[in-house]
Amino acid sequence: MNQTVKVKKKKKTITLGVVHIRASFNNTIVTFTDIQGNTISSASAGGNGFKGARKATPYAAQVTVDRASEKAKEYGLKTISIRIGGPGAQRESAMRALFGQNFVVTSILDVSSIAHNGVRPPKRRRV
């Protein structure tokens, strides 16, 4: 009689990590990584059931941060550094949601890319 034994994989404990928040005009993406950049958990507003213009709301960003941080806390993450980028209006509410998750925040860094007269903008919208 052959029996298979399931071996439960041991989760790594990571105490220090980086939170990458990308707040675009259309969506919010939150990624928790370790110091080397390996992804621990990630979530997006679209993946949390928000569709269309509701993905770009501050409430959607708050829910996204809550979902991603729940997964990251399973790894024992306690101390984070925040890297926030993008032009979206959800930046502030995403950071407030992170402060409410009882993480120790060591630094906040704005990594938004600033165009120095780079590419041509899209044509004006006609309604």
From Swiss-Prot:
Pfam families: Ribosomal_S11 (PF00411)
GO cellular component terms attached to this protein's record: ribonucleoprotein complex; ribosome
Keywords: Ribonucleoprotein, Ribosomal protein, RNA-binding, rRNA-binding
Keyword Cell cycle: no
Origin superkingdom: Bacteria
Molecular function, one GO term: structural constituent of ribosome
Statement: the UniProt record of this protein carries the keyword Transcription: no
BP GO terms, sorted: translation
Role summary: Located on the platform of the 30S subunit, it bridges several disparate RNA helices of the 16S rRNA. Forms part of the Shine-Dalgarno cleft in the 70S ribosome.
Protein family membership: Belongs to the universal ribosomal protein uS11 family.
Assembly description: Part of the 30S ribosomal subunit. Interacts with proteins S7 and S18. Binds to IF-3.
NCBIfam families per record: PRK05309.1 (NF003698), uS11_bact (TIGR03632)
The name this protein goes by in its record: Small ribosomal subunit protein uS11
Source organism (scientific name): Rickettsia rickettsii (strain Sheila Smith)
